[in-house]
Amino acid sequence: MIHESIEEFLAALPRSGALIGLDLGTKTIGVAVTDGLRRIATPLLTIRRTKFTEDAARLRAITAERGLVGIVLGLPRNMDGSEGPRAQSTRAFARNLSQVLPLPIGYWDERLSTVAAERALIEADTSRKRRAEVIDHVAAGYILQGVLDRLDWLGRERNA
């Protein structure tokens, strides 16, 4: 099931279990995962996109291997908050993915996540070639960590 708000997404998740974060591009999908306590996001890999069925099979295998309980998709909004063709494409991907992966799906605003990932890689003195190889899954890690920080804050609010 797809959840528009992060609060709805949190309510749909089991109390524990790792999540997968996706940074969807036209040619690649950046993948990051969390630990079971949902404290830290770790960039995992970049999938070179082919057909949806093959991409979905790869994601299904990763979620099964790692026992993941939810999916976070970066939603590429414009700087004014509106949604363009890339956001519509992401929503279509989520609808298709929800048909083959019965896990809660939540969206997270991914504005500037790739910029932040690029800056972090430059600060770490990563070569251009290496940055090109890892940028998508590092961006997925930024997206997923943003969600984890928000979920942590919401959890503290509930218990206050």
Swiss-Prot record:
<keyword id="KW-0540">Nuclease</keyword>
<dbReference type="Pfam" id="PF03652">
    <property type="entry name" value="RuvX"/>
</dbReference>
<comment type="similarity">
    <text>Belongs to the YqgF nuclease family.</text>
</comment>
<keyword id="KW-0963">Cytoplasm</keyword>
<dbReference type="InterPro" id="IPR005227">
    <property type="entry name" value="YqgF"/>
</dbReference>
<keyword id="KW-0378">Hydrolase</keyword>
<dbReference type="GO" id="GO:0005829">
    <property type="term" value="C:cytosol"/>
</dbReference>
<dbReference type="GO" id="GO:0004518">
    <property type="term" value="F:nuclease activity"/>
</dbReference>
<dbReference type="InterPro" id="IPR012337">
    <property type="entry name" value="RNaseH-like_sf"/>
</dbReference>
<protein>
    <recommendedName>
        <fullName>Putative pre-16S rRNA nuclease</fullName>
        <ecNumber>3.1.-.-</ecNumber>
    </recommendedName>
</protein>
<comment type="function">
    <text>Could be a nuclease involved in processing of the 5'-end of pre-16S rRNA.</text>
</comment>
<dbReference type="GO" id="GO:0000967">
    <property type="term" value="P:rRNA 5'-end processing"/>
</dbReference>
<dbReference type="InterPro" id="IPR006641">
    <property type="entry name" value="YqgF/RNaseH-like_dom"/>
</dbReference>
<keyword id="KW-0690">Ribosome biogenesis</keyword>
<dbReference type="InterPro" id="IPR037027">
    <property type="entry name" value="YqgF/RNaseH-like_dom_sf"/>
</dbReference>
